[in-house]
Amino acid sequence: MFTVVIVGRPNVGKSTLFNRMIKSDEKIKAITDKFPGVTRDINYGVAKWDDKEFIVVDTGGFFPEEKIEDIIQKQMLEQIEMAISDADLIIHLLDSKEGLLPDDIETARQLRQTGKDILWVVNKIDDPSKLSRIYDFYSIGTEELIPISGITGYGFDELIDKIIEKIPDTQPVNLEQQNLPKIAVVGRPNVGKSTIINALLGKKRMIVSPIPGTTRDTIDAICTYYGKKYLLIDTAGIKRLSYYKKEISQEIYVERLAYFKALRSIERADVAILVIDALEGIVNQDQKIAGIVAEQKKGLIILINKWDLIPANERDKKAKFFTDEIKHKLWFVDYAPYLTVSAIDKTRLTKIFPLIDQILEEYSKRVSTSELNRLFSEKLKDVIMSSHGKELKFYYITQVNVAPPTFVVFVNDQSAVKQHHIKFIEKLLRETFHFKFSPINIKIKQRK
């Protein structure tokens, strides 16, 4: 698909323009704010205008190589260069309020060396009265500048027209229509989520470093396994909610936005992969993240990462420890399979995909009403249970939805149904109809 990459210095408005271009309902698709450098990872989205579709790529702030100060900036620059190499069209976004700076001129020089098609776009021209700001930018070496405002939308239609003119008249591929399985990778900061994604993709799509919290935006990437495509979502590490109640600083503010983006990623997903640190075990925050997945009735795979750091002679004992730990601390997602993996060594990572396929097959499975009531007839119809002095009788059951499989059970007294009754029915459904790894949603209704 035709790919447009937005490049520019930190805080020139790249993410704001990106969000406007993809018209996303997810208003924080890319984290935006007044703080410089809040986009550290690459964001991908699909824009559709005038029956034309194209990929839009929002990059981190571009800066000359000689100004690199740390490992994070070095990795950011590598990501941007990779995105530029995949581009069909580059938007060099400039800031009219700050004016033309030496870094803009150096960036323009480097972009010209790529030989790619470039649009020179001057942002923060909120209305025609600000047009005089653009004249200094002609010295960058172009005959055409496009004045816009990512916030107000001034000049935006003209920019879209310019982009559409450059898209070949070929049938676009709609990523959403491909109906790819959507997989959210979730977990606490620094448990290895991005390393896992990078290993599955075979290239560095995300910043990976020993510094906790280096992924702040959710990132979508397509992974292919034996010809089948999966949409992988790497979320920012989810921290304790109490963490976000502290006094707001720049870092905490951005992390708070990232927290809610992570929740949105779980909402988007079909299956969530919860990454747990093998050295730290299952902690309270892991339980809370699993609880979010369970509440939303998403498929779940638990990955015990950093298995390479467990001494070989202790791994059997450690595996048994995690089996017991999952039963004890994650009892509410007892249907979820788990794997011990090493993102660094790429050990057992490919076992994820058969599990995803099985979960998705079960997740969309439909059981006929006749089969369900045959089960009830055999197991429950004549069974009368007591609950606090009340007689509870099950009449019949029907499946009303898939993704997740949702069943409605009709009883004589809805108030008498307790959680252990629901777990009993769930166990029957799982054993009889082979819902091994998928969540099941059971609703109780009183027969009138």
UniProtKB/Swiss-Prot annotation:
Database matches in SUPFAM superfamilies: P-loop containing nucleoside triphosphate hydrolases
EngA-type G domain segment(s): 2-171, 181-364
Positions of disulphide bridges: none
GO MF term set: GTP binding; ribosome binding
BP term (GO), one: ribosome biogenesis
Family classification: Belongs to the TRAFAC class TrmE-Era-EngA-EngB-Septin-like GTPase superfamily. EngA (Der) GTPase family.
Protein name (database record): GTPase Der
Source species: Thermodesulfovibrio yellowstonii (strain ATCC 51303 / DSM 11347 / YP87)
Gene: der
